[in-house]
C-alpha cells in the first residue's frame, strides 16, 4: 500500500485490504442507529458507511445545499408535490428532506436488499409516516434484471450493463450479482403521487430511468437533481433539453463544462417560478 495514498485517501486504501473485508462481516459492522445531525437517528452499518459517519457534513456539500434549498422552497410555496429519491441507497437525501420538511411525502426507490433493510429500520424506528419505500430499481421496462451489489460501500450498486462495477474497478473487490425487480417511474406517478423534485443516482442507468419517466416529466415537469458521467451524460442532457428543461452544473451552479457530473434541471413551467429557481441558485 502506498503511504502517500494511505494519508491522502486513508479510507479508500483501507477498503482494499483483506482485514477490512473480514471486519465487514463482523459484529463491528452490525446495523445500528446513528446520529447524523438530522432530527432523527438513521440506520447504517458502521464500517460500510464509515465515510458517511466521518464526513457527513462534508459529503457532497454543494449538492446537499442545493437540494436542501430546493426542498425548502417547495415547502414554503406549499407545493402539493412529493420527493422521489431514485437510487436512495441508505436514504441520505430522503432523510434530509424529512428532517427539513417533515410534512413532505417521500418515495424512496432502492433495489439493494441490504440498503432496503436500513431504510425500513429508519422509517420504523422514527415513525416516518410520510416516507414510502419501494424495493425496486427504476428503468425503462418492467421485469427482473441482474444487479451488481456493492457489499463494500453499499453506494455503487448498479444494473448489469457490461460496464465494470466501481467497486471492482477502483477497489479491486468483486461485486455480487443478484436479481432485482425493475419498473418505471411513470407507474408511480399518479394523481395521488406527483413528484415536485426527483433525485437520481443510479450509477450509469440514468437514460433508462428517464425514458421510464418520460410521461411524468412531460406532464408535471418536476425539478431534477441527478448524477451522470460521460458517455451517458450527453444522452441525459439531450433527453432533458428536448423536453424543454434548463440545465446547469449542480455543484458549480454554472453552465455545463468538462468536469460536470451532477446536473440541476428545471422546466420553466415546473412547480417553482423562475424567480424561486434563481433564488435557489444564488443562495
Show which residues each predicted segment covers.
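S-adenosyl-L-methionine
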Residues: 1-113, 117-183, ...
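Short internal loop-to-helix segment that lines adenine-nucleotide cofactor pockets
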Residues: 55-84, 132, 161-220, 231-235
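Conserved acidic-Pro-Pro-aromatic motif
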Residues: 81, 101-108, 184-283
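Short, glycine/acidic-enriched loop or turn micro-motifs at the edges of active sites
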Residues: 88-90, 113, 140, 202-204, ...
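Short N-terminal helix/helix-N-cap motif within the alpha/beta-hydrolase-1
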Residues: 92-95, 117, 143, 207-211
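Short, glycine/charged-enriched secondary-structure capping and boundary segments
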Residues: 97-101, 121-124, 147-150, 162, ...
